[in-house]
Amino acid sequence: MKNGHTTRQKVPAGRYALLDELRGLDLVSMMLYHACWDMMFLFGIWMDWYAGMPGRLWQQTICWVFILLSGFCAPFGRHMLRRGVTVFAAGALVTAVTLVFMPGGRVIFGVLTFLGTAMLLTGVLEPLLKKVMPAVGLAVSAVLFAVCYPVGLGWVGLGGWKLMLPQSLYANYFTAFFGFYPDWFYSADYFGLLPWLFLFWAGYYLHKAVGRRRMELLRRPVCPALGWMGRHSLLLYLLHQPVIYGVLSAAAVLFA
């Protein structure tokens, strides 16, 4: 409010404001989730609900929306490979920083590493992906995501069908990158290529199935503040954990 008149934040030309706002909302949810994680595992404040199914559902909701939306937005722009390199490098930075300063909360193959890899693979394979009808690609990607979802438990399957995978697949860091992590593997944030690449591709094909003409309704902003966060999600993601940790550390000293 300035001089009695309200001002609205401008949405950059060409942006689909509601997509930015959805990403911003998911980012806020993720920040709150990570704040709870820090309180539990770094500051010893136990929360039964967070350790149980409600916390699990919250975490899955955040990552499903984030990855599906990233896949949906992948066809925007003409520099998917460049974006993939940038996001992958940001993931490598997170890994390096956590290994040095927070080895107990280290992040190996986290969401940024995954998203960067998914963008690079999609950019390379896009000539082939474009040959698949969007509705078919969406359906196949969704089914493959469901089939591969339990890969971390040692099997794949759907409904009554279940195929146990050989334990030799779950061998080392290399196999963990693809989704087959051994028992000794630990990461505070982990997304292997399987099953999450198929969720990313489901978003990619959902974009193609919807079409740009039907997306015009998404240009109208509802909450510009969330839109700003969505447009700067990579920077905010890199900064949020140090800020949250600093705030919680200060609170611990003040209220000790």
Regions found by a protein language model. Name each.
Residues 1-256:
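Alpha-helical transmembrane segments and their immediate juxtamembrane cytosolic regions
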